[in-house]
A protein has these predicted regions:
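S-adenosylmethionine
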Residues: 1-376
Length: 376
């Protein structure tokens, strides 16, 4: 059977993404795909992206109702039958299938969170994530952007972050003049609040140890008013190249990039006023944006992650000066990666806890983030 234009790109995305590195985020993959395929218009992009997310989110019941071996084509065949949701609701399905989670992941969540909270979490993880941006305080104010946008888009200020604006419909942000001018960045409200644990001041020396492309640095940089120095450290040179573009667009001038093998690192030991360690984690708090992660979950890998998190934190701690402050962060809801790790750092590294921060995915609310601010 011949495929429609949308179906062709749908299967190109699904099959191509399935072959990518298992830690490559779905939202980033979609953005890159559509940038490479300019012929896909905005309406088609929305429809294709929504279908991609639905097929990945609801993989378990789609496979359950299919009479064919599990493929993206067989799942799409069931998905195209409008009554599949009603069938799923009417059938007495095992809870992990009804909630569309691997049985091992569902069982782990029940053990970690309790059955009621685990099932609430699973249901919320199958919803669409809210669309939130963070205003760049180096270039404008939230009031100015709200005033400019409210005539064009359904927008509202976020309830908790003083820098956030929520969009109530999908928008191609990358095409907006304000984005190209660096007036805002796309960032979940919970991520903005995690960055607020970094109460940096002008003149401080700051290290973002697992910086990625610099999202958290961009969030706290305006506090420094272009005075002091921020170091963005990551082991991936290509992601630091992306950080360089974002810093330039945002007008952050007091930042340097450090790859893991940079010889300058040794000179920075015990000199930082602030260190942020936004660690590699399970990503369980962001499954609405990256539902593929639930199908890749393995308990053995989580155990390896916990050990890796402790090792990275210990490395980052060597850059903190006496009386400096270090912020540990994840985008996870698992206590093993959050409260348990913070307790380990206090017990074994002679640190004192100053502040804990946590968000849990809520209906139309923030993603799941955790942060702990500690000091000697």
């Amino acid at each position: 059977m011949a495929l429609s234009f949308r179906e062709f790109h749908l299967f190109q995305i699904l099959n191509g993404f399935s072959q990518e590195n298992k830690r490559f985020p779905l939202d980033r993959y979609l953005s890159h795909y559509f940038r490479r395929h300019r012929a896909v218009g905005s309406k088609d992009r929305r429809m294709i992206a929504d279908t991609v997310y639905d097929l990945i989110r609801w993989r378990a019941p789609l496979d359950h109702f299919s009479i064919y071996p599990p493929t993206w084509e067989s799942r799409y065949f069931v998905y195209s039958q409008t009554a599949w949701r009603e069938r799923a609701q009417a059938a007495s399905l095992p809870p992990h299938i009804a909630l569309s989670f691997p049985q091992s992941y569902y069982s782990f969540l029940v053990a970690a969170l309790g059955r009621e909270k685990a099932e609430e979490f699973c249901a919320l993880s199958n919803e669409s994530a809210p669309t939130v941006v963070r205003v760049n305080g180096l270039k404008t104010t939230r009031e100015n952007l709200l005033k400019s946008w409210e005539r064009l888009y359904p927008v509202s200020p976020t309830s908790h972050s003083p820098w956030g604006i929520r969009f109530h419909k999908k928008v191609n942000f990358f095409a907006m003049k304000e984005f190209k001018e660096g007036l805002f960045e796309i960032q979940d409200e919970g991520s903005q609040l995690l960055a607020d644990l970094m109460e940096v001041e002008p003149g401080d020396q700051v290290l973002d140890y697992c910086s990625g492309s610099g999202g958290k640095t961009l969030a706290f940089a305006c506090r420094m008013q272009k005075r002091g120095q921020i170091y963005l450290h990551d082991k991936r040179k290509e992601i630091l190249a992306e950080a360089k573009k974002r810093l330039r667009r945002a007008g952050v001038q007091n930042a340097q990039l450090l790859c893991y093998d940079d010889p300058k690192k040794g000179q920075l030991k015990h000199t930082m006023d602030w260190v942020l360690v936004d660690l590699p984690c399970s990503g369980s708090g962001t499954l609405r944006r990256n539902p593929d992660m639930k199908w890749k979950f393995q308990r053995e890998e989580l155990e390896q992650l916990l050990a890796e998190q402790r090792n990275i934190f210990k490395e980052a701690l060597t850059f903190l000066k006496p009386k400096g402050k270090i912020v540990y962060g994840t985008c996870s809801v698992f206590p093993q990666e959050n409260e348990d790790q913070a307790a380990y750092f206090q017990k074994h590294l002679s640190l004192s806890l100053e502040r804990l921060f946590q968000t849990f995915p809520l209906h139309e609310g923030m993603d799941g983030f955790f942060g702990a601010r500690l000091t000697f």
